[in-house]
Design a protein with these regions (language model features):
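Polybasic low-complexity intrinsically disordered regions
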Residues: 1-78, 84, 88, 135, ...
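Surface-exposed, flexible loop/turn segments at secondary-structure boundaries
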Residues: 66, 91, 142
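Basic, amphipathic alpha-helical segments enriched in Lys/Arg and hydrophobic/aromatic residues
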Residues: 85, 94-150
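Positively charged, low-complexity intrinsically disordered regions
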Residues: 50-51, 77-80, 89, 107, ...
Length: 150
């Protein structure tokens, strides 16, 4: 399952990550690159409906605005959760470090250190998701053992 992302001009897949404030993985969904970000978020959040009952705030990129807010509100267990969209300032082009966005980018950087995740070697999206989970388990175990700086 590969697609073409016309915004970034790339073939392949998108990795949708749901992380906590420490950058540790809570959920992952891998989709074709042609799938819009908010549609990927809908499929990811559908799996998480009943797992995180204490969650009250979700920070998201501008790409996740729109239907996602209405969809979250329509779900009874998720009505207590507020979706905060981290917006880019008007008129600024190029790279800009956005508040809270760097949490996910840092996790992507951690995952990029694993050779198996540096390129899209996997045929099935489920295999990609599994390899991301394995890499995060390895990272968390090393962090618990104190062999890697946090």
């Amino acid at each position: 399952m590969h697609g073409y992302d016309t915004y970034k001009n790339v073939n392949g897949r998108k990795r949708h990550l749901f992380v906590d404030t420490l950058g540790l993985l809570l959920a992952v969904v891998v989709t074709a690159a042609s799938v819009q970000d908010r549609d990927g978020a809908l499929s990811m959040l559908a799996h998480l409906r009943h797992r995180f009952s204490r969650m009250r705030l979700i920070w998201a990129d501008q790409a996740y605005a729109g239907d996602l807010v209405a969809w979250l509100w329509s779900l009874r267990p998720w009505r207590k959760i507020r979706l905060a969209i981290v917006k880019r300032p008007e008129g600024i082009k190029g790279f800009l470090l956005l508040p809270k966005r760097w949490l996910v980018e840092r996790t992507f950087a951690w995952l990029g250190r694993y050779r198996r995740l540096s390129k899209d070697y996997e045929y099935l999206p489920r295999t990609s998701e599994t390899m991301i989970r394995v890499a995060m388990i390895h990272l968390m175990v090393r962090r618990l053992a104190g062999t890697v700086p946090s």
